Amino acid sequence: MKLDGYTRLTAVVANPIKHSISPFIHNRAFEATATNGAYVAWEIEASDLAETVANIRRYQMFGINLSMPYKEQVIPYLDKLSDEARLIGAVNTVVNENGNLIGYNTDGKGFFKCLPSFTISGKKMTLLGAGGAAKSILAQAILDGVSQISVFVRSVSMEKTRPYLDKLQEQTGFKVDLCALEYVSELQARIAESDLLVNATSVGMDGQSSPVPENIVLPETLLVADIIYQPFETPFLKWARSQGNPAVNGLGMLLYQAAEAFQLWTGKEMPTEEIWQSLTEKYQ
């Protein structure tokens, strides 16, 4: 990678963020597409967010990515939001269009792109969890024409989750069904009629636990996805594969949300296959 007076910067802004794999992905992409850009990680305090966003214009950057805790806090500093960012209420990518800062959320698009030969349009989905990743998957599914969504959260989280789903219905006219994870018979019934089952919780990161009981029976054609990629195969995915179901981890979502952002910044397609190779070697 050559750096010179014309190199344009991009960065991921979060706290903590030093561990991020994003610089690895994007700098590979800049190199592979012969784009004069560089991608770094900025770990900042909340009090520096406004100044950091102002620097996108000041230094004529391509833009930035955002992770926790700044995906929502950044919104007041932007000129415009994309449809999905408005629906989700969170931004993970800011694009500098001639000094106009536009907020996007590429997480949901990235998630659906990583599913092998699967389109959500007209399909039924069961989603476990209602945090940031779940919201982006939810909103994107609605924009892409999903026919039914059942969201399962622990009963203690029901009240916290409902206002967001009500807001989604208000904005899109789409009603999402909200259920308690503890009702196993309801979970079984919803999964039995689903085309896609997604774990969007952090359960399984320990390599031990699974978000659903093992006695749940999966329909044959159900695709199972987990947003976790460390461990590479969670107990949830192992269990799905043991029933003969196709199962996908979260590494593809990470790569394809980055590819979406890269295209928004540069107008170029990220060479995802090449980078996927390096990523799987790194994490498998």
UniProtKB/Swiss-Prot annotation:
EC number: 1.1.1.25
Pathway: Metabolic intermediate biosynthesis; chorismate biosynthesis; chorismate from D-erythrose 4-phosphate and phosphoenolpyruvate: step 4/7
Catalytic residues in the record: 71
Keywords: Amino-acid biosynthesis, Aromatic amino acid biosynthesis, NADP, Oxidoreductase
Binding-site residues for NADP(+), renumbered to this chain: 83, 129-133, 227, 250
Gene Ontology annotations of biological process type: amino acid biosynthetic process; aromatic amino acid family biosynthetic process; chorismate biosynthetic process; shikimate metabolic process
Gene3D superfamilies, per database record: Leucine Dehydrogenase, chain A, domain 1, NAD(P)-binding Rossmann-like Domain
Binding-site list for shikimate: 20-22, 67, 92, 107, 229
MF (Gene Ontology): NADP binding; shikimate 3-dehydrogenase (NADP+) activity
Keyword Amino-acid biosynthesis part of the UniProt annotation: yes
Assembly and interaction partners: Homodimer.
Similarity comment: Belongs to the shikimate dehydrogenase family.
Protein name: Shikimate dehydrogenase (NADP(+))
Gene source species: Streptococcus pneumoniae (strain Taiwan19F-14)
Lineage: Bacteria, Bacillati, Bacillota, Bacilli, Lactobacillales
